[in-house]
């Protein structure tokens, strides 16, 4: 995610440097593209956080299931 922000920062810097050589329409288009990319990065970040939460819940469920199985095995050994 940090790499993406660095790339986006470079795009902003490049568009700023090219502003003297470019028309306003091109600069506005680049700004719009950057805003779109920032929105996509934010959405992907939210998706990753949601997946992380789901993975943690699955790990917790697996640990509880393993504990139940361990308890059943112990009761059979007695």
UniProtKB/Swiss-Prot annotation:
UniProt GO MF annotations: lipid binding; peptidoglycan binding
Covalent lipid adducts (S-diacylglycerol cysteine), residues: 21
Database matches in InterPro entries: Lipoprotein_leucine-zipper_dom (IPR006817), MOM_Lpp (IPR016367)
Lipidated positions per record (N-palmitoyl cysteine): 21
Disulfide-bond pairs as recorded: none
Keyword Transferase on entry: no
Compartments reported by the entry: Cell outer membrane; Secreted, Cell wall
Signal peptide: 1-20
UniProt entry tagged with the keyword Signal: yes
Residues annotated with N6-murein peptidoglycan lysine modification: 78
Alphabetical UniProt keywords: Cell outer membrane, Cell wall, Coiled coil, Lipoprotein, Membrane, Palmitate, Peptidoglycan-anchor, Repeat, Secreted, Signal
Stored Pfam families: LPP
An annotated GO BP: lipid modification
Membrane topology listed for this record: Lipid-anchor; Peptidoglycan-anchor
Sequence repeats: 24-34, 38-48
GO cellular component annotations of the record: cell outer membrane; extracellular region
Residue ranges of coiled coil: 27-75
Subunit structure: Homotrimer.
Family of this protein: Belongs to the Lpp family.
HAMAP family hit by this protein: Lpp
Protein name: Major outer membrane lipoprotein Lpp
Gene source species: Photorhabdus laumondii subsp. laumondii (strain DSM 15139 / CIP 105565 / TT01) (Photorhabdus luminescens subsp. laumondii)
Taxonomic lineage of the native organism: Bacteria, Pseudomonadati, Pseudomonadota, Gammaproteobacteria, Enterobacterales
Gene coding for it: lpp
């Amino acid at each position: 995610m940090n790499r993406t922000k660095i790339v986006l920062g470079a795009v902003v810097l490049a568009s700023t440097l090219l502003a003297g050589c470019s028309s306003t329409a091109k600069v506005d288009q680049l700004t719009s593209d950057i805003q779109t990319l920032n929105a996509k990065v934010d959405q992907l970040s939210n998706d990753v956080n949601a997946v992380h939460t789901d993975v943690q819940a699955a790990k917790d469920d697996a640990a509880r299931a393993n504990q139940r199985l361990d308890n059943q095995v112990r009761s059979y050994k007695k």
